[in-house]
From Swiss-Prot:
Localization per Swiss-Prot or TrEMBL: Cell projection, Cilium, Flagellum
The organism's place on the tree of life at top rank: Eukaryota
Gene assigned in the entry: GARIN2
Name recorded for this polypeptide: Golgi-associated RAB2 interactor protein 2
GO biological process: flagellated sperm motility
Length: 422
């Protein structure tokens, strides 16, 4: 017990020794502010105390062979504020000597009284106050720059506990107020961020759809494994035209194709007559395409040889009828048939214009007339033979200037037998 009491008395005596030479009225800072030199700080300090600067371990820091003494005051910058927001720091400076006094007199007299001078003005929003060591009654002052200072309370022993408790209560009040302000600032910043995102992120629905269509490459399901891809240029996304311009058909529908009937025309020759099966051609609907393959060509050559064998060398036949027989086997063919396949579904056909009905009817009439011509010629030949037999019997009676009917029929082969008697 004696050792503990002796330690406490030694600490108190040491502290008194540090504070006694520099002790002054605790209201000196308030009196200085009331003097009118510092007009902005009209309101008196809320709390004022004397401190000495120590290090983190509690050891006193000496400056010019003495302790660094400082007066700390917390006050309002304006009467409208409800909570203090300013921290003031003041130091004692020795008073100026008079010039009239001689050096000898100045040495004999006591030193002049020290004067309190305001040296620092710190807003509390840039300062953090906390209790560093409650046993030694030291506080920690941390600035916004990161530097920290440790201050130990310096006052008379019977006032230390009361005054230090006031500082602890003030520090807790200031910290609570800082926490509220920080929360309000965070909420305001978050609201500002949400508002900015609402403003900048607000987009029209049409804008959203256009951007999704531009980001995805257009893929047209053409027929087959090939796909048509088109990349969009952003400044020209409004000028994009549809690529499905082949036939403007949906993807799943198959275009209707007109029926194309391939008909092979078979020609039969019976006794120098060409008979064509025209009934199939007239009844078929759509486009009639005639293909002549090698077999048909061979058949035609054989028919021509048969015609040569059938016709007698002494038979009279006009050259015009031969040319008509040759020309009778005309075939209407459709040329320039181009089939363009796009994959497996789409195709285009380009055909030459189809002949008119008048031309087809004319050809049919020509064919029927050609069929009738051989019959008519055969009857004419028979009549000529009978007439030649009759004329041979009457040659003696006829005069020499009259020509035989056979020669007349050679000139006019199309006349019938009754008209030749005239």
């Amino acid at each position: 017990m004696k050792k503990n009491t002796s330690k406490t008395t030694m600490r108190i005596n040491k502290q008194d020794a540090l504070c006694t030479p520099h002790s002054h009225d605790p209201r000196d800072l308030q009196n200085m502010l009331d003097g009118g030199e510092y007009a902005p700080f009209v309101s008196p300090p809320m709390l004022e105390s004397n401190f000495i600067q120590v290090n983190r371990r509690g050891e006193s820091i000496y400056l010019h062979n003495r302790a660094n003494w400082v007066t700390v005051g917390i006050c309002f910058s304006s009467s409208t504020h409800k909570i203090p927001n300013v921290m003031l720091l003041a130091h004692l400076t020795p008073g100026a000597q008079k010039d009239t006094e001689t050096l000898f007199k100045s040495l004999l007299t006591s030193p002049p009284a020290e004067k309190l001078v305001l040296t620092r003005f710190l807003p509390l929003q840039f300062v953090t106050l906390s209790v560093h060591d409650a046993e030694n009654m030291s506080l920690k002052v941390k600035l916004v720059s990161g530097r920290a200072y440790y201050l130990q309370l310096c006052t008379s022993a019977y006032k230390q506990d009361t005054l230090f408790s006031q500082w602890v209560a003030l520090i807790s009040l200031l910290n609570q107020e800082k926490a509220k302000v920080s929360k309000v600032s965070e909420v305001s910043s978050l609201s500002g961020i949400t508002n900015s995102t609402d403003i900048t992120g607000s987009m029209d629905v049409t804008d959203v759809t256009t951007f999704t269509a531009i980001l995805t490459p257009y893929m047209y399901a053409g027929t087959g494994p090939e796909h048509v891809r088109d990349s969009i240029d952003f400044p020209e996304f409004t000028d994009i035209t549809d690529i499905t311009d082949v036939t403007d058909l949906p993807e799943n529908e198959v275009p209707e194709v007109p029926d194309v009937r391939i008909v092979t025309e078979v020609i039969e020759v019976r006794e120098a007559t060409e008979v064509t099966d025209s009934s199939d051609i007239t009844n078929c609907s759509g486009v009639t395409v005639v293909f002549e393959n090698n077999d048909l060509i061979r058949a035609k050559q054989e028919e021509k040889e048969k015609l040569k064998n059938i016709l007698k060398p002494g038979c009279l036949q006009d050259t015009k009828s031969k040319s008509e027989l040759k020309e009778s086997s005309k075939h209407v063919t459709i040329s320039n048939i181009t089939l363009t396949f796009e994959g497996k579904r789409y195709f285009q056909t380009t055909l030459t214009p189809v002949e008119s009905e008048a031309n087809t009817s004319k050809e049919m009439k020509d064919k029927t007339s050609e069929e009738k011509m051989p019959d008519f010629q055969s009857t004419a030949l028979k009549a000529e033979e009978s007439r030649s037999l009759r004329t041979e019997s009457n040659t003696s009676v006829l005069s020499p200037h009259i020509k035989s009917p056979s020669n007349f029929l050679k000139l006019v082969p199309h006349l019938s037998a009754p008209f030749s008697r005239e």
